């Protein structure tokens, strides 16, 4: 597959993201506008819950209402208070989110507690399922670090009802890596849930070349046809600029951002 071909696919799989403390309505509107490209639109935009209504309005105004709106809960620290995570998820759904990316209580798992993670995901899933909202679970691979813990967090999340497992918040020193992605994709394969569980690489995927490596990895493990927006996403902001440069046949630009 050529770089242009993989860049076009990667664009269609993006959750175009802004999750900054200084986000404003204007920045969210600009994000939505950036997602309307001559090469198509991303799968979703991802914003903080309070910006979901403004994103909905912006997407509709520009004729791209097919773009989903994702948001985050229990973010970014993955605290182990189930009630707060559930309350935040209920609020996110009430704001009108199509998808919720909840942070798994990874520190509890690192301390040996598997139950909190299971219950938190299970209860958030119940909230989402009642409103036909997709639930992605961020396991924070760069903090879990070991293959054993990454696999365990993936398994717990899947068994508790996750629709997607996601590498990272983008708020810690180490985010998505191909090594971590392989463990998560192989867990989806080994549990025989590829028909109902997807994978999202977030943070650290910045170039068309890097995106192509993730696509190739997913195709190797789960098959060519599996890689579509129902099963695979990139969480990114700066990646879009680079993909558009590749699609326009320009040399890669150095970009900063998530």
From Swiss-Prot:
Keyword Protein biosynthesis: no
EC number: 4.1.2.4
Catalytic activity: 2-deoxy-D-ribose 5-phosphate = D-glyceraldehyde 3-phosphate + acetaldehyde
Molecular function terms, GO-annotated: deoxyribose-phosphate aldolase activity
Protein family according to the UniProt entry: Belongs to the DeoC/FbaB aldolase family. DeoC type 2 subfamily.
PANTHER family: DEOXYRIBOSE-PHOSPHATE ALDOLASE (PTHR10889:SF3)
Protein name: Deoxyribose-phosphate aldolase
Organism of derivation: Actinobacillus pleuropneumoniae serotype 5b (strain L20)
Organism ancestry: Bacteria, Pseudomonadati, Pseudomonadota, Gammaproteobacteria, Pasteurellales
